[in-house]
């Protein structure tokens, strides 16, 4: 009997219906963030957008996204002009939340990823639309004839959300080697291609930043886009190297009296409180932005060497993925939501063979489980858990059937790590979501967050190490 697969239209209908059902769901502070940005772009002239600070939710996205908010504000006028008043702080109610969700659902892709499901359709952001642009750019890079459009589309994406700068080194090296230099010799420059790419990127940047540059506001925009005054770790530790570093620091605080270690009293509450700009370590040395930048740059440069030597599309996607890994694992003040920078490009090559799938599997589990704390109200618990677990089961079963055998030897230990890691995730989810509250009530509230973050960090780091091996041995 032939297998039956749903059509794209059927998936779109189901996805759209599900997103409409989520209109009354939990409303995060991001609702007020985007309402305030609508109000700023509608109420003030262009020159004041990046200076206005009536609300703590100041505009800190690049100009193209600010222009998008202005367009959305013109629609919001028809719904309720009161929501466009800057002083109407915390204005969003259920009806306005529904109208914003409806507009946002129409603007994003129909991907059924639990990550986008949690971040965009409940927590409320616009990642789906921008990841759709990223995927289009990555796909366009596959053909020489559309390589220019890939670079220009990515440049436009950078002007919408600056987090994609993390992936820019891979784009720079690939476009340089595959488009600007001759395939026969790196010492021969294709000048016409350089002119077309440079002019296109210049036009995009000029459109985005030109009006602000005329007023001398570029430094102010950069201050908003790159606020290094914030701490190393976000309020909830992103599952990266610094989460593991923070966990070790917490353990050493307990062991310090026995080991004779000195403890900085002023830092004892810093990591557990997770306040912005408040990250300090009690036993281990503090980490500076320079250290984060240096580590990120080093671990991004390593895969770029192979990409420059062998500028194939598979190597390009691998380098984009590894640039995402490096920035997520070693970056300063990384948000847990940034894990999608790794998951989404990696998914394009996860089925290349079983070695790729073996590296992707723990990332898929860790990345999606790490997003659970974003939805902390009881009403969303069954939704996020059942949907994510169901998606992961389908993914593990379907991808396992579809991934072809590798022509190279697989790594026994890594395969066992992947299986064990996925198995442990089930009791961890149960404890952090239900068990802790039953046993401890409202005491030790930081423990489930710490366990989730640290466990997820092990999966992400393990996946990164595994994929580095796969990338350089393929």
From Swiss-Prot:
Bilayer topology term: Multi-pass membrane protein
Taxonomic superkingdom: Eukaryota
Any single GO CC term annotated in Swiss-Prot or TrEMBL for this entry: endoplasmic reticulum membrane
EC number(s) stated in the UniProt entry for this protein: 2.4.1.265
Recorded GO MF terms: dolichyl pyrophosphate Glc1Man9GlcNAc2 alpha-1,3-glucosyltransferase activity
Keyword hit for Transmembrane helix: yes
Reaction catalysis annotation: an alpha-D-Glc-(1->3)-alpha-D-Man-(1->2)-alpha-D-Man-(1->2)-alpha-D-Man-(1->3)-[alpha-D-Man-(1->2)-alpha-D-Man-(1->3)-[alpha-D-Man-(1->2)-alpha-D-Man-(1->6)]-alpha-D-Man-(1->6)]-beta-D-Man-(1->4)-beta-D-GlcNAc-(1->4)-alpha-D-GlcNAc-diphospho-di-trans,poly-cis-dolichol + a di-trans,poly-cis-dolichyl beta-D-glucosyl phosphate = an alpha-D-Glc-(1->3)-alpha-D-Glc-(1->3)-alpha-D-Man-(1->2)-alpha-D-Man-(1->2)-alpha-D-Man-(1->3)-[alpha-D-Man-(1->2)-alpha-D-Man-(1->3)-[alpha-D-Man-(1->2)-alpha-D-Man-(1->6)]-alpha-D-Man-(1->6)]-beta-D-Man-(1->4)-beta-D-GlcNAc-(1->4)-alpha-D-GlcNAc-diphospho-di-trans,poly-cis-dolichol + a di-trans,poly-cis-dolichyl phosphate + H(+)
Listed PANTHER family: DOLICHYL GLYCOSYLTRANSFERASE, DOLICHYL PYROPHOSPHATE GLC1MAN9GLCNAC2 ALPHA-1,3-GLUCOSYLTRANSFERASE-RELATED
Protein name, entry field: Dolichyl pyrophosphate Glc1Man9GlcNAc2 alpha-1,3-glucosyltransferase
Keywords: Endoplasmic reticulum, Glycosyltransferase, Membrane, Transferase, Transmembrane, Transmembrane helix
Enzyme's top EC category: transferase
Topology feature Lumenal, residues: 1-3, 123-155, 215-234, 312-328, 377-378, 441-449
